[in-house]
């Protein structure tokens, strides 16, 4: 079925048009024309605009504001609109009604993917048109407009697909607004390390900023790495527009498969184990590939010029990436973790009643594999200096495995023991293990409390400044593994009780 014949898309289009699009388009036109008027005024009376040295510089500034508004409307506004539409229609039962029609899952998903955000799409087209006029009047290369629009619309499709999966996972539309707010607040912090943080390529801020630079500046060496240079993937320069597109495409295929599967059968997991590992692997390798050239396997000794080190503090980069790995892994684990009842039914159908069979299907085994893979990728930064920095690596790798195992065990334990109250008790446990030590450290002004946190040992060890208490951190990691063992025992007990009840019934 073509898109203009898709019943879901047609319905969403009618709803958008019924709500009115003219006012929204006029607002976008006023924004674009205001910026265009600024450029026209500069060309007429350059003396009134002392901040610009040339018409090209003025054009870049006004066009940058135009695409900033376009990103805000199309990517962030579209994400929120699709999420709220899908959550509300699931709550009203319309999603399930559409599933019972002869429509294929791909047709249903594409209708919700491209239909609800049409108002935002019209606004973005208006801004893109005025942006093209600005580029032409400022005598800028048209490739600037083509490249930035390509990046913006590809990012919009990628984030809209994430909105589909989020809408299939949560029925409260407020969660989408909260997710957008968190992303808007967190994203600017990645600008501190422009070419080294993956979020600058998922939302292609680096690629867009790079297109604004003079092409002749791209021939600079790696030591001058900033917004003007190509990112380096394992020390190989890669055009940022291609890097962003390849990253969005590879992840988008996995997200599309998840949306299709969840639409065909709502009892299927959002992400299969193989897809979870593939997604985690793509994100992890891409992120560590971007920063590998800083140390080139000789961590903590930087392998780049002293000029770069003097102007850029890299000591906190790997700890930040370490924490980001935790956040990314926990999200993927939560999405890929099957419900205990689903695992139990699958095991009973196969007539397997041992804990080994349950372990192979649970999130715990997935967490173990992900932790091992994260440790292997982290080893790339230590491969040539492992003899003198093995303690740092051991602490960071052990911390990665411990965090993922503790989360997976707690997640399933709370589901088994607390049922519908599982999320609240999981949040309580994570707060006590991860954040309470930092609060106690602030209250009592003792940094040792902070190191007890489940998140702290790896971050502290990976800080490039000299550390005298590595043995102490190794002891904390060992204590975390003892906690993991206790949770493992409790996890086994809960599963035995569930299997006993199933056998009795």
Feature map (PLM): residue ranges:
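Hydrophobic alpha-helical transmembrane segments of membrane proteins
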Residues: 1-92, 112-505
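Short helix-to-coil transition segments within interhelical loops
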Residues: 97-106
């Amino acid at each position: 079925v073509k898109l203009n014949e898709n019943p879901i898309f047609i319905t969403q289009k009618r709803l958008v048009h019924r709500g009115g699009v003219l006012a929204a388009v006029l607002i976008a036109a006023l924004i674009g024309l205001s910026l265009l008027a600024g450029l026209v005024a500069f060309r007429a009376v350059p003396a009134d605009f002392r901040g610009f040295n040339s018409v090209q510089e003025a054009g870049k500034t006004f066009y940058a504001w135009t695409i900033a508004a376009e990103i805000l409307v199309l990517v962030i506004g579209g994400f929120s609109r699709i999420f709220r539409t899908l959550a509300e229609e699931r709550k009203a039962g319309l999603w399930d009604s559409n599933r019972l029609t002869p429509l294929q899952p791909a047709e249903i998903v594409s209708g919700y993917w491209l239909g609800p955000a049409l108002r935002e799409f019209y606004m973005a087209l208006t801004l893109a048109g005025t942006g093209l006029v600005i580029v032409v009047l400022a005598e800028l290369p048209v490739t600037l407009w083509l490249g930035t629009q390509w990046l913006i619309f590809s990012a919009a499709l990628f984030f809209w697909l994430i909105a589909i999966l989020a809408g299939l996972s949560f029925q409260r539309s407020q969660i989408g607004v909260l997710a957008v707010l968190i992303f808007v607040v967190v994203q600017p912090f990645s600008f501190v390390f422009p070419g080294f943080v993956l979020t600058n390529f998922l939302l292609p801020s680096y690629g867009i900023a790079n297109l604004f630079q003079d092409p002749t500046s791209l021939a600079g060496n790696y030591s001058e790495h900033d917004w003007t240079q190509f990112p380096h993937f394992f020390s190989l320069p890669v055009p940022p527009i291609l890097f962003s597109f390849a990253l969005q495409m590879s992840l988008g295929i996995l997200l599309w498969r998840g949306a299709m599967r969840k639409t065909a059968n709502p009892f299927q997991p959002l992400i299969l184990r193989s897809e979870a590992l593939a997604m985690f692997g793509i994100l992890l390798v891409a992120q560590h590939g971007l920063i590998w050239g800083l140390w080139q396997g000789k961590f903590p000794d930087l392998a780049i010029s002293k000029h770069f080190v003097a102007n850029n503090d890299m000591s906190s980069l790997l700890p930040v990436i370490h924490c980001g790995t935790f956040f990314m892994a926990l999200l993927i684990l939560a999405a890929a973790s099957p419900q205990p009842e689903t695992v139990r039914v699958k095991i009973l159908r196969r007539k397997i009643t041992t804990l080994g069979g349950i372990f192979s299907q649970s999130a715990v085994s997935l967490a173990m594999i992900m932790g091992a893979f994260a440790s292997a990728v982290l080893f790339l930064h230590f491969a040539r200096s492992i003899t003198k920095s093995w303690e740092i690596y051991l602490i960071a790798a052990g911390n990665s495995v411990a965090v993922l195992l503790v989360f997976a065990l707690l997640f399933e334990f709370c589901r088994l023991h607390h049922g519908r109250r599982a999320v609240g008790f999981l949040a309580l446990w994570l707060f006590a293990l991860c954040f309470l030590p930092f609060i106690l450290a602030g209250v009592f002004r003792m940094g040792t409390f902070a190191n007890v946190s489940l998140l702290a040992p790896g971050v502290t060890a990976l800080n490039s400044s000299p550390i005298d208490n590595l043995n102490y951190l190794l002891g904390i990691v060992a204590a975390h593994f003892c906690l993991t063992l206790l949770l493992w025992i409790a996890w086994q007990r809960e599963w035995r009780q569930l299997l006993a009840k199933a056998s009795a019934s």
